[in-house]
């Protein structure tokens, strides 16, 4: 197999043979040759119905002709300039038009950079140092947010190379647990600059907020002059034109964006209330910069993607997601398996646990060995999902009914085999 040969070569020059940890799975990942619509082709000549979709950016599917055409036209004019472009203005205006909290936008190169800037900005605006995140949430690969679950001084780095002092100001609480958050705010609220939350936890599988939970966060942050930041790197432009804040009708102070906003190219963005955003340099003194901020190729891909995402497309995505989740639940019921199917709109995951999944602690009870058997079983049948129990699956506008039917047939075969 060519993928096996490529993986051997890759392992000599790339740590672990990949450029990002989650792409690695045993015995080796397949290597991509190309993609079209909802199908991903491997160098081995295999074709897969793709529910990974590059971990979320490809809401239109692979190689949408309009996006490809727009990008090619931009590349002919240049790939980067180092001066502003009209495209940046147009994409920022499109974001502001769609996203409820967005009054100004700063482009970055990734979601990680966007959350870094958001935390710095919140600290500067409030004059406070501490931040709150949720157990199991992921906000990029920077030091302040790579922490193990813990309380106060028990918080510890989640990676070697991060000084303990760096994360002493990062507090963690369980998701969907109002009492834990209320206790934390009561004890440390005057020192907390921001609460950073994925409205749907998409990096521990796919966990929705319980009814009223996001509004609870909005209320308690307002009462305590704490900045509420929605990390919508995953949910932005996926659940609705305005993302999770439109979908759940709760408006934060700041929002971080990534993935879909770049239309398949590297891109991030920080947006929010004008009075906060005006503190970013050069308008203010909170420093944020980047050689490729507002890169014209990424901006072009993002702008064209947002143009294509209309109301009908979101209705179709919602319908497809509902159909697939209902189909999986029916399969589990027929097979007398008590696993959990979760997710809103075009997001989903199957947890191999019999208990309801409300937060990180619940998700960690899943049988990850069984999940990987499920993953490989689907892969053998031409269906590709992320190779981790703790990632989220995505549906694109390019998935059709026949793809969902084929996926459910494959899932039935695999789950039946696992039961037996």
Curated annotation (Swiss-Prot):
Q: Cellular location of this protein?
A: Cytoplasm
Could you say which EC number(s) this protein's record lists? 5.4.3.8
GO cellular-component term (any): cytoplasm
Q: Give the catalysed reaction(s), semicolon-separated.
A: (S)-4-amino-5-oxopentanoate = 5-aminolevulinate
Required cofactor(s): pyridoxal 5'-phosphate
The source's domain of life comes to Archaea
Pathway in which the depicted protein is active: Porphyrin-containing compound metabolism; protoporphyrin-IX biosynthesis; 5-aminolevulinate from L-glutamyl-tRNA(Glu): step 2/2
Q: Is the keyword Isomerase assigned to this protein?
A: yes
What residue stretch is flagged as signal peptide? Answer: none
The protein's UniProt keywords, in alphabetical order, are: Cytoplasm, Isomerase, Porphyrin biosynthesis, Pyridoxal phosphate
Please give one Pfam family short name.
Answer: Aminotran_3
The record ties this protein, via NCBIfam families, to:
hemL, PRK00062.1
Report the sequence similarity comment from the record.
Answer: Belongs to the class-III pyridoxal-phosphate-dependent aminotransferase family. HemL subfamily.
Question: What is this protein called in UniProt?
Answer: Glutamate-1-semialdehyde 2,1-aminomutase
**Protein source organism:** Methanothermobacter thermautotrophicus (strain ATCC 29096 / DSM 1053 / JCM 10044 / NBRC 100330 / Delta H)
């Amino acid at each position: 197999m060519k993928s096996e040969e490529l993986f051997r070569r890759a392992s000599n020059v790339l740590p672990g043979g990949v450029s990002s940890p989650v792409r690695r799975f045993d015995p080796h990942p397949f290597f991509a040759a190309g993609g079209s619509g909802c199908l991903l082709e491997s160098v081995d000549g295999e074709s897969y119905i793709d529910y990974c979709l590059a971990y979320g950016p490809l809401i239109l599917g692979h190689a949408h002709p309009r996006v490809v055409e727009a990008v090619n036209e931009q590349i002919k004019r240049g790939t980067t300039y180092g001066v502003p472009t009209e495209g940046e203005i147009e994409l920022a205006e499109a974001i502001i038009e769609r996203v409820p909290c967005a009054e100004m936008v700063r482009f970055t190169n990734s979601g990680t950079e966007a959350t870094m800037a958001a935390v710095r900005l919140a600290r500067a605006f409030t004059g406070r140092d501490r931040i709150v995140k949720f157990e199991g949430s992921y906000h990029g690969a920077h030091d302040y947010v790579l922490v193990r679950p813990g309380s106060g001084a028990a918080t510890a780095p989640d990676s070697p190379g991060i000084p303990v002092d760096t994360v002493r100001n990062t507090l963690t609480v369980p998701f969907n647990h109002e009492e834990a958050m209320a206790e934390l705010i009561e004890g440390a609220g005057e020192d907390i600059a921001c609460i950073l939350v994925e409205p749907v936890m998409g990096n521990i599988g796919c966990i929705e907020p319980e009814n009223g939970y996001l509004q609870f966060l909005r209320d308690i942050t307002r009462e305590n002059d704490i900045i509420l930041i929605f990390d919508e790197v995953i949910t932005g432009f996926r659940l609705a034109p305005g993302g999770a804040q439109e979908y759940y009708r709760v408006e934060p102070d700041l929002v971080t964006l990534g993935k879909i906003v770049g239309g398949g190219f590297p891109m991030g963005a920080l947006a929010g209330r004008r009075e906060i955003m005006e503190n970013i340099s050069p308008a203010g003194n909170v420093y944020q910069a980047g050689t490729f901020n507002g890169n014209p190729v990424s901006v072009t891909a993002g702008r064209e993607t947002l143009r294509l995402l209309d109301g009908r497309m979101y209705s179709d995505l919602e319908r497809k997601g509902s159909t697939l989740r209902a189909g999986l639940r029916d399969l589990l019921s027929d097979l007398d398996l008590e696993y959990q199917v979760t997710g809103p709109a075009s997001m989903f995951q199957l947890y191999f646990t019999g208990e309801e999944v409300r937060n990180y602690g619940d998700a960690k009870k899943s049988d990850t060995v069984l999940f990987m058997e499920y993953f490989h079983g689907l892969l053998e049948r031409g269906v590709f999902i992320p190779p981790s129990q703790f990632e989220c699956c995505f549906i694109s506008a390019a998935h059709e009914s026949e793809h969902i039917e084929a996926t459910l047939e494959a899932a039935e075969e695999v789950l039946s085999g696992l039961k037996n």
